[in-house]
């Protein structure tokens, strides 16, 4: 319960003093850096999930290897 009282007093202090500009500015600056990085990390995962595992050259190499192995047997 004491931490809630301290938090209310701290926020009230920030609202009436000039330090509030620096505090809220630092929070906003951090949020502006954090939000785009979170959004981009989620979109990268989606793109990676949709991307095909093999590129065309790898598929061709796999088919060629299977063909050569079948000739050996």
From Swiss-Prot:
Could you state one GO biological process linked to this protein? defense response to other organism
Q: What is its main location?
A: secreted
Q: Name one GO cellular component term.
A: membrane
Q: Could you tell me in which tissues this protein is expressed?
A: Expressed by the venom gland.
Q: Give start-end of the signal peptide.
A: 1-22
Compartments annotated for it: namely:
Secreted; Target cell membrane
Q: Which residues form a coiled coil?
A: none
Q: Mark which residues the record calls propeptide.
A: 47-73
* UniProt entry keywords in alphabetical sequence: Cleavage on pair of basic residues, Cytolysis, Hemolysis, Membrane, Secreted, Signal, Target cell membrane, Target membrane
Similarity comment text for this entry: Belongs to the non-disulfide-bridged peptide (NDBP) superfamily. Medium-length antimicrobial peptide (group 3) family.
> What biological function has been recorded for the protein in this entry?
Amphipathic peptide with potent activities against Gram-positive bacteria (MIC=5.6-30.0 uM) and weaker activities against the tested Gram-negative bacteria (MIC=15 uM to >45 uM). It has high hemolytic activity against human erythrocytes. May act by disrupting the integrity of the bacterial cell membrane.
Q: What is this protein called?
A: Heterin-2
Organism (species): Heterometrus spinifer (Asia giant forest scorpion)
